[in-house]
């Protein structure tokens, strides 16, 4: 292959898109796009009681926090707080037709052995995952003290009482010995920052707030309300890849507006074979999770237990592309080998498009020209076929994006496309780019009145991404200064295991307060900065998108990076820390 020619093509695709696009957050005049369409609001009286633990966020991270604390500490009163109408997090909000996990269900859905659940498919539907998360909440008694349809407005530390004061938009003011925040990655929807956004007179909504009252149907399809409708979708990421076949089946006309094409590989979904679980030994899920984690981090294993496109593709590329801490061999030769392997994989995906899409011009427009991990890979067995339907039009904007909206439609490439319904598949506020407290919607006031928004004004400061000096009995679950991996649920499982261990130590040793020491925090921050710039060159050569801050990776604070030594090493750091038993880097009082 002519590697320089490949690089030049990728550069052209990057450069014609410029540096990113602007977004409009779903707040203020656009807050309707973030309202809950699924659960009718219920009124209640404010609470002024006390709990052992307040957990902000009732998604996978919040549920695992509650479950681990129940298992490890025996703490009785654990209160989940969420603005949604139930547990589930992203699986509560995302109910769009076709929604599924893109990581194998057997390694993604947490606590399968503990709950006694076996997923019905290799890649479960959103409703199946949501129901499983509800079962977790029931099993561990997490509904009992939960507050739904409730937004935290402030967390404030009371030093004399060694308690957190939790204020909410319902007038609650209650106390908690510990607080844990797990606000998630897909917490707040964002819209494209388009001229005319406020003037569009048709029906519109964000995919994470799906309006089934308008479209009809449910998460499995059956969108009968779209039979006579012209529908537009802005965005071609993983949501649209799953959604498009259902829209195409029911809409009179479907326009898919594309800035950058997705890289779509085979999904290969299948039902769980009868009796599959009968031969599984105790501990099977953790072993399977760790096997997947290692393979997708470039660490060879004796066996590939998952055997999907994540493991088959990522295992070939990850050693050279991802920061695993393995520095063996000539770095330049490793990089070249990785680049060649990357090109071969992307050529495979581009060839698949030619084999499926019948119109040559449409096929050409759907081809992604960037490296594998510039964007999260997509997997689907029906998306590309959608573009063979006569009622579907791909509006490729040549990397420029939609120009503007009018009262009746969407303008792209100088042409107006009239639509009755406009669906925004434009993602969420990004945790690396949007300040934590802004994305959370509240500030955290620690010892001496210091606000987290002030302490983190130039970027995060933590120990292991979990605890912050000056904020006692407080835990934050995120990817910032912590491990990052394609299986987010696994990483949350490891973080919450660590959190519960720390709380257990505090309780067993008779202390009231635990926090990161100043020295412990400083040492971890130095390690984050030392490793933070490792993937900047890679990201700078990607087309603009979520991972590279819309083409400006250098514009993100390095302090907000994930741990640069790889997620496997991050998990090992936490395990070695627990095994040492000396609680290094913490202060207990």
From Swiss-Prot:
**Enzyme Commission number(s) from the entry:** 1.14.13.170
What does the record give as its pathway?
A: Antibiotic biosynthesis; pentalenolactone biosynthesis
Q: What is this protein called?
A: Pentalenolactone D synthase
* Coiled-coil blocks: none
Which keywords annotate this record? Antibiotic biosynthesis, FAD, Flavoprotein, Monooxygenase, NADP, Oxidoreductase
Cofactor binding notes: Binds 1 FAD per subunit.
InterPro entries linked to this entry: FAD-binding_Monooxygenases (IPR050775), FAD/NAD-bd_sf (IPR036188), Neo-PentlctneDsynPtlE (IPR054972)
Q: Quote the record's binding site residues for FAD.
A: 60-61, 82-83, 90-91, 102-103, 108, 152, 491
Question: What is the role of this chain?
Answer: Catalyzes the flavin-dependent Baeyer-Villiger oxidation of 1-deoxy-11-oxopentalenic acid to pentalenolactone D in the biosynthesis of pentalenolactone antibiotic.
């Amino acid at each position: 292959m002519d590697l320089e020619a490949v690089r030049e093509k990728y550069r052209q695709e990057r450069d014609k898109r410029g540096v990113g696009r602007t977004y409009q957050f779903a707040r203020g005049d656009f807050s309707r796009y973030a309202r809950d369409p699924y659960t009718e609001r219920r009124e209640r009286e404010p609470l002024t009681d006390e709990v052992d633990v307040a957990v902000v966020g009732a998604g996978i991270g919040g549920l695992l926090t509650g479950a681990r604390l129940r298992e490890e500490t025996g703490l009785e009163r654990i209160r989940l707080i969420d603005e949604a109408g139930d547990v589930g997090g992203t699986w509560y909000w995302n109910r769009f037709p076709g929604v599924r996990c893109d990581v194998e269900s057997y390694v993604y859905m947490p606590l399968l052995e503990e709950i006694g659940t076996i997923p019905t498919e290799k890649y479960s539907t959103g409703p199946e995952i949501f129901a499983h998360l509800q079962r977790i909440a029931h099993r561990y008694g997490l509904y009992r003290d939960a507050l739904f349809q409730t937004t935290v407005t402030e967390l404030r530390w009371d030093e004399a009482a060694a308690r957190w004061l939790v204020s909410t938009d319902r007038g609650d003011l209650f106390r908690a010995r510990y607080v844990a925040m797990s606000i998630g990655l897909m917490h707040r929807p964002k819209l494209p920052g388009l001229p005319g956004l406020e003037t569009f007179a048709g029906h519109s909504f964000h995919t994470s707030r799906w309006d089934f009252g308008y479209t009809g149907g449910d998460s499995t399809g059956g969108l009968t309300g779209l039979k006579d409708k012209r529908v537009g979708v802005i965005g071609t990421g993983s949501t649209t890849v799953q959604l498009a076949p259902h829209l195409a089946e029911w809409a009179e006309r479907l326009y898919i507006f594309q800035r950058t094409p997705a890289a779509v590989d085979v999904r290969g979904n299948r039902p769980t074979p009868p009796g599959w679980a009968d031969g599984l030994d105790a501990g099977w899920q953790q072993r399977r999770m760790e096997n997947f984690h290692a393979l997708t981090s470039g660490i060879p294993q004796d066996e590939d237990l998952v055997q999907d496109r994540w493991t088959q593709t990522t295992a070939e590329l990850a050693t050279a592309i991802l920061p695993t801490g393995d520095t063996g061999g000539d770095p330049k030769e490793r990089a070249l080998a990785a680049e060649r392997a990357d090109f071969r994989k992307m050529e495979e995906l581009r060839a698949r498009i030619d084999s499926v899409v019948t119109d040559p011009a449409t096929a050409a427009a759907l081809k992604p020209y960037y490296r594998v991990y510039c964007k999260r890979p997509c997997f689907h067995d029906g998306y590309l076929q959608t573009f063979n339907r006569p009622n579907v039009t791909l509006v490729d904007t040549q990397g420029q994006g939609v120009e503007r909206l009018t009262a009746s439609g969407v303008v792209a490439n100088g042409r107006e496309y009239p639509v009755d319904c406009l669906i925004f598949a434009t993602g969420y506020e990004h945790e690396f780019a949007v300040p934590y407290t802004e994305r959370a919607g509240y500030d955290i006031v620690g010892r001496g009145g210091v606000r987290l928004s002030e302490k983190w004004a130039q970027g995060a400061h933590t120990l292991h991404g979990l605890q912050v000096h000056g904020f006692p009995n407080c835990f934050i679950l995120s990817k910032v200064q912590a491990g990052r991996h394609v299986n987010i649920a696994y990483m949350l499982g490891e973080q919450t295991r660590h959190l519960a261990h720390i709380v257990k130590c505090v309780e067993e040793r008779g202390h009231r307060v635990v926090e990161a020491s100043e020295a412990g925090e400083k040492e971890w921050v130095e390690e984050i900065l030392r490793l933070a710039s490792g993937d900047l060159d890679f990201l700078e050569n990607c087309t603009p998108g979520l991972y590279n801050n819309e083409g400006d990776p250098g514009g993100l604070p390095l302090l907000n990076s994930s741990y640069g030594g790889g997620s496997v090493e991050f998990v090992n750091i936490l395990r070695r820390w627990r095994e040492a038993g000396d609680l290094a880097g913490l202060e207990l009082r």
